Amino acid sequence: QVRPFLEVHERSACQARETLVSILQEYPDEISDIFRPSCVAVLRCSGCCTDESLKCTPVGKHTVDLQIMRVNPRTQSSKMEVMKFTEHTACECRPRRKQGEPDGPKEKPR
């Protein structure tokens, strides 16, 4: 069965969608412990923009608290704890920044 163009287009558009992220990528300084689960589902911006010069970018964010099990491999002890993760609430296609380009506007020479 062929999926209609409008559905294909809508599903591929820039939007916040459930994405699996590794806890160790979000908390790289916590490498000495093991987390269960090792990744969590959060909303993150992804999708296609109408032009290759644009990138799907978050324009709204909030923090969610998720309960995770932390295991200490040396002592084999475990505990439940709450960890904070960023979720994207709104997304827009914005111009891609070139490598080495400053974040702010460029000053004009005088």
Curated annotation (Swiss-Prot):
Tell me which UniProt keywords the record has, alphabetically. Disulfide bond, Growth factor, Pyrrolidone carboxylic acid, Secreted, Toxin
Name the principal localization, coarsely classed.
Answer: secreted
Residues with the modification Pyrrolidone carboxylic acid, per the entry, are: Q1
PROSITE patterns according to UniProt: PDGF_1 (PS00249), PDGF_2 (PS50278)
GO BP annotations of the record are: induction of positive chemotaxis; positive regulation of angiogenesis; positive regulation of endothelial cell proliferation; positive regulation of mast cell chemotaxis; response to hypoxia; sprouting angiogenesis; vascular endothelial growth factor receptor signaling pathway; vascular endothelial growth factor signaling pathway
Q: Does the keyword Transport apply?
A: no
The domain of life is Eukaryota
Cellular compartment(s): Secreted
Q: List the disulfide bonds.
A: C14-C56, C45-C91, C49-C93
Q: In which tissues is it expressed?
A: Expressed by the venom gland.
MF terms in GO: chemoattractant activity; growth factor activity; toxin activity; vascular endothelial growth factor receptor binding
Entries under SUPFAM superfamilies matching the protein: Cystine-knot cytokines (SSF57501)
Other comment: Negative results: does not interact with VEGF receptor-1 (Flt-1), VEGF receptor-3 (FLT4), and neuropilin-1 (NRP1).
Name of the protein in question: Snake venom vascular endothelial growth factor toxin HF
